[in-house]
Structure formats: C-alpha cells, structure tokens
Amino acid sequence: MTLCIAANIAAVRARIAHAAEQAGRDAGEITLVGISKTHPAASVRAAFDAGLRDFGENRVQEASAKIDELRAANVLPRWHLVGHLQRNKVAAAVDRFDILHSIDSIRVAEAINERAAIPVRVLIEVNIGGEASKLGVAPEEASALAANIAKMRQLELIGLMTVAPRVDDPEDVRPVFRRLRELRDAIGLRELSMGMTDDFEVAVSEGSTLVRVGRAIFGDRAIEAR
C-alpha cells in the first residue's frame, strides 16, 4: 500500500507541475491536499511518509477519531475540512482542523469566532454553478460574507472554494474555475481551492492554489461511514 500511494502522489505532483508549466505558473504555489475521507489512518500515514503534508476530510465526526489516532502516533499533517460544517460540529472542527474550506453562512462564521482560541484560516464556499444539489453561497453574496468575516478576530479569511459540476469533459468546468478566480481577485484574497481528481489540471491552469485529490492518490473510497 505504501509504495502504491507514494507512486500515486508522485504521479499527481508531476501532472500538477506540467499543468502549471503549461499555464506559466510556479508549481510551488500550488498545494496538493490529499482527500482521505473514508480511508483509514494507515493510508494517511503512508501518504505522510511519502511526503504529503496536507489532508482533507469531509465529515468532522468521521475525521475526529482518525486525526486523534494519528496525533497519538505523532503524525501531524495540516488538516483541511472540505465538507459542510454544521454549527453543532464547530467545537470539534476548530480543535482538529487547520483550515476550513466550506464556510457558507454568517452563523457558522460567528460560531467559529466564538469557539476558536486562536485565529482559524477559512475559505468561503461558493456555488459558482448554481446547482441545487451543492452547498455554498451564491457568487453575488460572497463579497458581503467576506466583509463580515473580515470583522471577526478569530477568523482569517484566505480565499474561496468551489466544487465544480460533474462532467464528462473537464474542459466543460473551465468557466466555473475562471469565474471563481475572477471573484477571488475582485474580493482581494489569496487562495483558490478548486479542482479534484477528474479536473485538477484545468483548475491549475485557471489559478487554483489548493487542489483536492482523493481517488488518484488513495484509490476508490471505502464504504461511506454512516
């Protein structure tokens, strides 16, 4: 397992580097986040041993036991929460995650501000595609939420995140990534969390700084935790 995961990480990094070169970008400004949701702590350990330092999880409850197990083993990567954050999970989230990608309401932001002992890095999730099945604020609401978050002492707003629609051709989501970049630039933020296993090269070419790759590193996900 360890050798397979290490080889997968190397292959993904090579693809990121190629996409960055084609776009005239420095690959060093792009962080690879390994999405380890539904995969065991042993898989995270294997990826960590292969040099990966950033990992993403979707569910606070599922991730908490995994993070605590790895902490006990002195495996201390940066943890990214990329799934929806409910207010009743805020305390557990701020105690375990370094970066929260999915802030989509003032109420959740306020709850984080009240609970966090030290400033927490956050991104606003934007539903660029306007899909009813997706979470995130509408693009026209992002600036107002950003302005409100900027007033909160315990939140450091660093960027925007989106989950692109599922399509057969990755090029079809280029306008989604481009629009998020334009919105990020208009608000004046640094990070862009966009791009997953099937479309991260297009995301890199459109300015992504945080690519969230799961299947290409860890293989097909395990059975979803209920």
Language model segments and positions:
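Conserved alpha/beta-domain cores
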Residues: 1-198, 204-206, 218-221
